[in-house]
Amino acid sequence: MPLTGKQRRQLRGLGHHLEPVVIVGQSGVTEGVIAAVEQALHDHELIKVKINEGPEDRHEAAEKLAQGTSAELVQLLGRTALLFKKRAEDSEFEDY
């Protein structure tokens, strides 16, 4: 289910102080990057991903990451994407 504007605003506030946990390198979005993002989302639910110069532009890379991990793209600010995926069990974000 897509996030509402209010939920996105709250997640942006929570993600403001986070550091990027995954960095997309010059090879772009690969299966290894998607696996790393998937694991980070499972561990943290809300993560930042730094997107460096690569074969695709930052919008394409962020969308590919969101689709590849079934996550919601909360925000794309510059080269940093904020992704959210709620855990099925034991989630810190029950209202989402």
Question: Could you say what each language-model-derived stretch is?
Answer:
Residues 1-96:
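Positively charged, polar, low-complexity stretches
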